[in-house]
Amino acid sequence: MSQSLFSLAFGVGTQNRQEAWLEVFYALPLLKPSSEIVAAVAPILGYAAGNQALTFTSQQAYQLADALKGIDAAQSALLSRLAESQKPLVATLLAEDAAPSSTAEAYLKLHLLSHRLVKPHAVNLSGIFPLLPNVAWTNIGAVDLAELAELQLEARLKGKLLEVFSVDKFPKMTDYVVPAGVRIADTARVRLGAYIGEGTTVMHEGFVNFNAGTEGPGMIEGRVSAGVFVGKGSDLGGGCSTMGTLSGGGNIVISVGEGCLIGANAGIGIPLGDRNIVEAGLYITAGTKVALLDEQNALVKVVKARDLAGQPDLLFRRNSQNGAVECKTNKTAIELNEALHAHN
């Protein structure tokens, strides 16, 4: 048996009446755990190889805690707590970063992102949607939709209310981890699987999808769509949009460089380089025709926005007289042409 793993985590979760997993909570996921940890836990769990999600008992949890006592105190303490659980326990061991094949594996991948152990696009999430059941997220936790009506009636008969916060495949991140050094005004707007860097503020209108996020510090008052990563020091204005890889059929990975500003109700469908500004209300798609202006405001040429992807120090604006989309730079016409040629 190989003693190297891509990831290892001990979790407690929720199953429906058919004992199918609805969700899993991993308090302390590990990325590339030491060979000593793997060697200590594998025999107790009966793990041999590959990517597996193995259920274990309270008795095994005590054994695992004892085995890790002199190797990893934090994991040992966690397992001692898990041994007291009334809910089902699962150990997920990933030998490699392959596409997830179970709900427990999918949840571990999402935890790795939100615990800042990996960045967006750095972990394989292929085929994750069918592995995440659509469940009711309630004040008593995850509930299978087929069991919801009965539980709602049961609560009412006891004079109580079963409150449903959302019906979705993804829970909110803060029910699983709150990364250090962040502010999130409305926690329902940040999904598990988001990477929220230290110093990030997500205001009420901000939204961060899974496999997306921020380097931090930064202010997010707009939408960070799936697959989008925002560089440090960048601000997304109220109601602005970043085009995700899940919508529109595009496969271009949209990113926002460092020190950028996307104005209120603006949007981007191209990757932005460092120190770019997009005027409020202006949505730039890859095919948008852009009048490129030099430092003297003279027209250099008209290009498609995709030709400016990743270029630094650009100001995108709309001409208030004729409606043309313009891009102002601090470069000469010669420098602009050289930059475009190098980019192509």
From Swiss-Prot:
| Record note on cofactor | Magnesium ions are not essential for catalysis.
The keyword NAD belongs to this UniProt entry's keyword annotation: no
Question: What's the Enzyme Commission number for this chain?
Answer: 2.3.1.117
Instruction: Give start-end of the signal peptide.
Output: none
Q: Name one GO biological process term.
A: lysine biosynthetic process via diaminopimelate
Its pathway, per UniProt, is: Amino-acid biosynthesis; L-lysine biosynthesis via DAP pathway; LL-2,6-diaminopimelate from (S)-tetrahydrodipicolinate (succinylase route): step 1/3
Q: Name one GO molecular function term.
A: magnesium ion binding
Q: Which reaction does it catalyse?
A: (S)-2,3,4,5-tetrahydrodipicolinate + succinyl-CoA + H2O = (S)-2-succinylamino-6-oxoheptanedioate + CoA
Gene Ontology cellular-component annotations:
cytoplasm
Task: List the active site.
Answer: 221 (acyl-anhydride intermediate)
> Per its Swiss-Prot or TrEMBL record, what regulates the activity?
Weakly inhibited by D-2-aminopimelate.
Q: Where does succinyl-CoA bind?
A: 223, 238, 241, 264, 279-280, 287-289, 304, 317-320
Q: Which CDD domains match?
A: LbH_THP_succinylT_putative
Q: Which residues bind Mg(2+)?
A: 205
Domain of life, per the record? Bacteria
Q: Among its keywords, does the record have Acyltransferase?
A: yes
**Subunit annotation:** Homotrimer.
User: What's its job?
Assistant: Catalyzes the conversion of the cyclic tetrahydrodipicolinate (THDP) into the acyclic N-succinyl-L-2-amino-6-oxopimelate using succinyl-CoA. Displays succinyl transferase activity with L-2-aminopimelate and succinyl-CoA as substrates.
Family of this protein: Belongs to the type 2 tetrahydrodipicolinate N-succinyltransferase family.
- Please state what the protein is called: 2,3,4,5-tetrahydropyridine-2,6-dicarboxylate N-succinyltransferase
UniProt source species: Pseudomonas aeruginosa (strain ATCC 15692 / DSM 22644 / CIP 104116 / JCM 14847 / LMG 12228 / 1C / PRS 101 / PAO1)
This chain is encoded by the gene named dapD
